[in-house]
């Protein structure tokens, strides 16, 4: 990604920071969350609780209109400016954040009271526990990926590759999960950046299977057989923030989300991902704990995609998928019906701190659905099928990456709107609380910005069986300026403008594919396919005499099975026709065979055989 000159970036930062920093409403004391108050009621004086302290000076990422990289610098500046504003119990280990101007620490009830009374503190919350969206089904580890992920064709990803040559190349996709096994053959060379927030290990790993499976659906290749990744040309920015069992602290998720915005720690480099796939959830639908994170991602140009959850039934979507700023993804089976486990909307907000919607506001969810049942993808040691909205979310995230490659200047709002507008509407007409806008259609989304591919028309094809090495296809096609071909799944030829395409084929059976190519390089992903057999030997006929019901019968056999004979193909010189001819007074002197291409072969019958 490009870089902004340092002097220009500083100027942009100064301007943006001047209008972006604001103070949260003042009060006699900070708001202590209901969950924290409940825990404090049963906490001894010498015990400590994990809390997140949010300070009043904040950068409003949701209203930020400056340069994206300037947002990172402004967020960092706000955090540094308030670094000494928190009352601590002497030397104390704290984690400071800049994504939201906040601090996490373990604090005693007395310290929490002092912090809440500080005029620079806006709120004190109990650190929330999150977990990976549990898989509903998981197969044993397999030695190959078989036919691959059925979802790739279901959402039109393969058509995007074939028609537009778009595979996600140049796009980075973020994933916050249990880690990734970078040694899986489908993920080798796919990791662009890595950070372990759980154990601090330098090299990528996955002590579960969840993260590696998600990663495979995002960018996996086809080393195990069939293709498993929707955007195989993209790379991954991976943050391990969940344990191998899929559990994690909210503060670790904030740290991972913050790192996603600036993996190399240099605001002048735009190394953040274009979309982040999240298959984890916090149980409370209207918990605004992660709202600043999602808003900051969007302000930076990152599409936030979240699994809806696997609880099933109405009103069961957790946060952050429940936010209007998030793309919540439900799961469908291969017959395009909603899975029983897929969490549904609507979400009714009971927000009391003013950070979310007004109490009683109803938000429709999910936003989209995607394949999430028996999805084949990578795991440590091989491949496996899994089911869950965790498997559906990466289909949508990778589709967003394909769309971003097709239209790099699209905003987050435009990407999401395009994915919804081009989705395959399922269930009741229009958006609903089971399927959202429908099943994501990557091909329709890309087509909407790049135009429809050309079509390949066939005026005349060569015969199925020919006796020459040269064959000619007479072609036409709507929107076509040229045509390309390949033989037996080899390399595609360079496009040629002529509508008469002559190919050289070796002897034998061949699969010939021809595609129309538009002036802008877009190709017809379907094209035409024909089987052509070259056999220059021609048919070989053998005749033998048998006795049938006391009569002498001559039977002709064709030795070369490559030739398919026309009906009534045996032509007896005596005028009789058929596969078997009964000798009468005068037996034929020869037999002629004609094949579907019109080629003939004649075999004389010895007089001794005819007697």
Regions found by a protein language model. Name each.
Residues 38, 149, 228, 270-277, ...:
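C-terminal subdomain of the subtilisin-like protease fold in secreted/lumenal serine endopeptidases
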Residues 31, 46, 64, 148, ...:
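Subtilisin-like serine protease catalytic core
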């Amino acid at each position: 990604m490009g870089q902004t000159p340092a002097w220009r970036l500083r100027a942009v930062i100064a301007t943006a920071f001047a209008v972006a920093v604001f103070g949260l409403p003042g009060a006699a004391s900070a708001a202590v969350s209901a969950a924290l108050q409940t825990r404090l009621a049963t906490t001894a004086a010498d015990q400590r609780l994990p809390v997140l302290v949010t300070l009043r000076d904040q950068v409003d990422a949701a209203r930020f209109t400056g340069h994206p990289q300037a947002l990172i610098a402004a967020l960092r500046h706000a955090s540094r400016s308030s670094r000494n504003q928190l009352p601590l119990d002497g030397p104390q280990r704290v984690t400071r954040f800049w994504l939201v101007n906040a601090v996490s620490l373990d604090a005693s009830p007395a310290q929490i009271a002092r912090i809440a009374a500080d005029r620079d503190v806006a709120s004190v919350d109990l650190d929330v526990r999150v977990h990976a969206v549990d898989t509903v089904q998981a197969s044993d580890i397999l030695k190959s990926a078989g036919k691959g992920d059925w979802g790739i064709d279901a959402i039109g990803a393969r058509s995007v590759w074939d028609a537009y040559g778009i595979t996600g190349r140049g796009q980075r996709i973020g994933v916050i999960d249990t880690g990734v096994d970078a040694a899986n053959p489908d993920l080798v060379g796919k990791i662009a950046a890595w950070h372990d927030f759980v154990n601090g290990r330098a090299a990528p790993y996955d002590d579960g299977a969840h993260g590696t499976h998600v990663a495979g659906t995002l960018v996996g290749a086809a080393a195990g057989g069939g293709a498993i990744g929707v955007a195989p040309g993209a790379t991954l920015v991976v943050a391990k923030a969940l344990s191998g069992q899929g559990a994690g602290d909210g503060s670790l998720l904030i740290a991972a989300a913050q790192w996603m915005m600036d993996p190399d720690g240099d605001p002048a480099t735009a190394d953040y991902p274009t979309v982040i796939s999240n298959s984890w959830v916090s149980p409370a639908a209207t918990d605004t704990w992660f709202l600043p994170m999602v808003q900051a991602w969007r302000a930076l140009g990152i599409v936030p995609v979240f699994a809806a959850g696997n609880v099933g039934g109405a009103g069961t979507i957790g946060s952050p998928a429940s936010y209007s700023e998030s793309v919540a993804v439900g799961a469908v089976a291969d017959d395009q019906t909603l899975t029983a486990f897929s969490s549904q909307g609507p979400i009714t907000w009971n927000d009391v701190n003013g950070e979310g919607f007004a109490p009683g506001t109803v938000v429709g969810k999910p936003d989209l659905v995607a394949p999430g049942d028996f999805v084949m993808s990578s795991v440590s040691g091989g491949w496996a099928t899994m089911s869950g909205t965790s498997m559906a979310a990466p289909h949508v995230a990778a589709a967003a990456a394909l769309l971003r490659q097709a239209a790099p200047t699209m905003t987050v709002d435009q990407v999401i709107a395009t994915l919804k507008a081009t989705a395959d509407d399922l269930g009741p007409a229009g958006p609903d609380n089971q399927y959202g806008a429908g099943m994501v259609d990557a091909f329709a989304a890309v087509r909407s910005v790049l135009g429809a591919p050309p079509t390949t028309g066939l005026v005349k094809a060569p015969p199925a069986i020919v006796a020459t090495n040269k064959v000619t296809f007479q072609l036409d096609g709507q929107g076509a300026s040229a045509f390309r071909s390949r033989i037996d799944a080899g390399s595609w030829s360079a496009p040629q403008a002529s509508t008469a395409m002559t190919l050289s084929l070796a002897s034998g059976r061949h699969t010939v594919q021809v595609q129309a190519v538009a002036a802008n390089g877009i190709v017809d992903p379907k094209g035409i396919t024909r089987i052509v057999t070259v056999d220059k030997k021609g048919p070989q006929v053998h005749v033998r005499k048998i006795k049938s019901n006391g009569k002498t019968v001559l039977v002709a056999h064709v030795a070369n099975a490559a030739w398919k004979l026309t009906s009534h193909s045996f032509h007896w010189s005596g005028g009789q026709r058929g596969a078997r001819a009964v000798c009468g007074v005068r037996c034929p002197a020869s037999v002629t065979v004609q094949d579907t291409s019109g080629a003939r072969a004649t075999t004389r019958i010895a007089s001794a055989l005819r007697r």
